[in-house]
């Protein structure tokens, strides 16, 4: 059948006015055809009906009640960047920033002093944390969306580069903490607690990865390690790790980072939890959102 194509927003050069396309043809095939004609990557193209309903991949025109002669609106989303690349850039920032501070702290603070053991351990924990995140971004995580607008990269990186990078580094490695002391047994407890939280977070990410086969967008109810108590144990263990970190560093900046990060994760978790309840009628109602037995 013949459908009409029209640009939504900025005019798309070389977009054909009409196209012969079967009613049961997949939206993926439609994207490929329009991409080949306009020479725009498929990730830049978004299709919608006249009422603004977005045409999703792995669906057909028939699903949206599109008939012969109907108008399909095509929007150019602009330059895109892969989500995997976004995550890698986000986590690279703190790694570079903390390394810069640890190598140049005397020059940065204009004072001759030596870092205490707590500060050195804090540096190691930060580096291990974000190296783990880089590893997960490359080898573990599967992304439901392939790309995001390139213009959003600065906004996405701000939290990690500024808050967990510059903000944490400046206030953790400063001379005001150079004489901090924690009893060895207390220090060992905090390190072991941090390691437990980080490894538990990694374990939950592996469980989530294994729930979705590669190339699939299938969604199922997660179970197992932590998931029987809360919907998002990965967020809980992430917050727990930063709690141990804040106790170790004794820095008010670490507590602010813990609060801001945990609050943001709870907002995400609350929305996703509501989606679980709506999508799965048999979803366990006893599960809390993020904090076991409480919230």
UniProtKB/Swiss-Prot annotation:
Any one biological process term the GO annotation gives: very long-chain fatty acid biosynthetic process
Catalytic reaction equation(s): a (2E)-enoyl-CoA + NADPH + H(+) = a 2,3-saturated acyl-CoA + NADP(+)
Biological classification of the source: Eukaryota, Fungi, Dikarya, Ascomycota, Taphrinomycotina
UniProt similarity note: Belongs to the steroid 5-alpha reductase family.
Protein location: Endoplasmic reticulum membrane
Protein name per Swiss-Prot or TrEMBL: Putative enoyl reductase C646.07c
Its EC number(s): 1.3.1.38
Pfam families in alphabetical order: Steroid_dh
């Amino acid at each position: 059948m013949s459908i009409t194509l029209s640009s939504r927003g900025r005019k798309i050069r070389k977009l054909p006015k009409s196209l012969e396309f079967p009613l049961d043809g997949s939206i993926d095939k439609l994207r490929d055809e329009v991409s080949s004609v306009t020479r725009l990557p498929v990730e830049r193209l978004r299709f919608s009906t006249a009422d603004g309903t977005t045409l999703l991949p792995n669906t057909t025109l028939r699903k949206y009640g599109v008939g012969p002669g109907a108008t399909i609106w095509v929007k150019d989303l602009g330059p895109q960047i892969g989500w995997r690349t976004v995550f890698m850039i986000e986590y690279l920032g703190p790694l570079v920033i903390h390394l810069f501070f640890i190598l140049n702290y005397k020059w940065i603070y204009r004072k001759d002093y030596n870092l205490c053991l707590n500060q050195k351990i804090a540096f190691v924990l930060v580096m291990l944390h974000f190296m783990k995140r880089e590893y997960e971004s490359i080898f573990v995580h599967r992304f439901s969306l392939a790309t995001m607008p390139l213009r959003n990269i600065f906004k996405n990186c701000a939290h990690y580069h500024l808050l967990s990078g510059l903000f944490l580094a400046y206030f953790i490695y400063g001379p005001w903490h150079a004489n901090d002391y924690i009893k060895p047994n207390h220090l060992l407890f905090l390190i072991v607690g941090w390691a437990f939280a980080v490894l538990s977070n990694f374990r939950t990410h592996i469980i989530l990865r294994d729930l979705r086969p590669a190339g699939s967008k299938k969604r199922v109810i997660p179970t197992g390690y932590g998931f029987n108590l809360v919907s998002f144990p990965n967020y809980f263990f992430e917050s727990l790790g930063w709690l141990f970190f804040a106790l170790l560093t004794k820095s008010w900046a670490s507590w602010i980072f813990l609060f801001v990060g945990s609050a943001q994760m709870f907002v995400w978790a609350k929305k996703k939890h509501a989606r679980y309840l709506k999508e799965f009628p048999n979803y366990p109602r006893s599960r809390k959102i993020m904090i076991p037995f409480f919230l």
